[in-house]
Curated annotation (Swiss-Prot):
Native source organism of the sequence: Corynebacterium efficiens (strain DSM 44549 / YS-314 / AJ 12310 / JCM 11189 / NBRC 100395)
Name of the protein this chain belongs to: Orotidine 5'-phosphate decarboxylase
Active site: K97
EC number(s) reported in the record: 4.1.1.23
Record has Chloroplast as a keyword: no
Catalytic activity: orotidine 5'-phosphate + H(+) = UMP + CO2
């Protein structure tokens, strides 16, 4: 039986903790690190991040857009970054936020989750706003290969509330519907006492988040660190799914680069802020 992404993530967390660190090589950060704003600078930035994070955190999240902006050379750097991280035992979620229908969605699924793809990752982020069912190709491939899918449910950007907080006739918000759909896909694994492959993205700064009890999948939680989310927030929102909650931090750690030692210290200090996700 193929081990699920949820199981792989819990295994990694048992030795590396429940922290996800983003690799976000945006232009201002490349400049701050004294690197050229081109594919060469991108490659050096990524190399430094791999050295700093590959053996210190459970989950690393490259932001695909910052590689895509450099075209084929950027994607070549991304391929190498993903491959090297995975070779060194670090789980990788590619933050691509893909969303489409039919054969096009199947193409995205193959690109990011098929073991034979040069971009093959442990997980990928996807957008459900063409309908949750439109994502079925990526769910199918995730189940086949034990890969993960993080579905955008309740994101931390303020613009999201006007859409994600809308409710149906029963008063259930769109974000809650997405969580419920993900939980339904994970239900067969719950019956086998295994964490499933389908996770959600839920911001750590939300005042009215969806209920996550029963999700049985990983929760990627942006909004901590620079954006103000705390361990208390993460624990309160995650509730009884806290063991599957992974706060995501990028800027607060990357600001300490480009020195590898300083980046590793920043990871250690940030992880210490989230040891047990205390709840009120």
């Amino acid at each position: 039986m193929t081990q699920t992404f949820g199981e792989n993530l819990l295994d990694a967390a048992s030795t590396r903790g429940r922290l996800c660190v983003g690799i976000d090589p945006h232009e201002s950060l490349l400049r701050a690190w004294g690197l050229p704003v081109d594919a060469t600078g991108l490659a050096e930035f990524s190399r430094i991040c791999v050295e700093a994070f590959a053996d210190t955190v459970a989950l690393v999240k490259p932001q695909v857009a910052f590689y895509e902006r450099f075209g084929s050379r950027g994607f070549a750097v991304l391929e190498e970054t993903i491959g090297t991280l995975r070779e060194r035992g670090c789980l990788v979620v590619s933050d691509a936020k893909r969303g489409d229908i039919g054969s096009t969605m199947a193409g995205y699924a193959t690109a990011w989750l098929d073991p034979g793809s040069p971009l093959s990752s442990d997980a990928v982020t996807v957008s459900p706003y063409l309908g949750f069912g439109s994502l079925q190709p990526v769910f199918d491939l995730a189940e086949e290969h034990g890969r993960g899918v993080f579905v955008l449910a309740a994101t931390s950007n303020p613009e999201a509330r006007v859409l994600q907080d809308q409710t149906d006739a029963s008063g259930v918000s769109i974000s809650q519907q997405i969580v419920n759909e993900a939980a339904a896909l994970n239900a067969p694994h719950l019956a086998q006492h295994r964490a499933g492959n389908i996770g959600v993205v839920v911001g750590a700064t939300l005042t009215d988040p969806p209920a996550l009890s029963g999700l049985n999948g990983a929760i990627l939680m942006p909004g901590v660190g620079t954006q103000g989310g705390t361990a208390q927030d993460v624990g309160t929102i995650a509730g009884d799914m806290a063991h599957l909650a992974f706060p995501n931090v990028s800027r607060a750690v990357l600001a300490q680069g480009p020195d590898v030692g300083n980046l590793r210290v920043a990871v250690s200090e940030t992880a210490a802020e989230f040891p047990g996700f205390p709840r009120s």
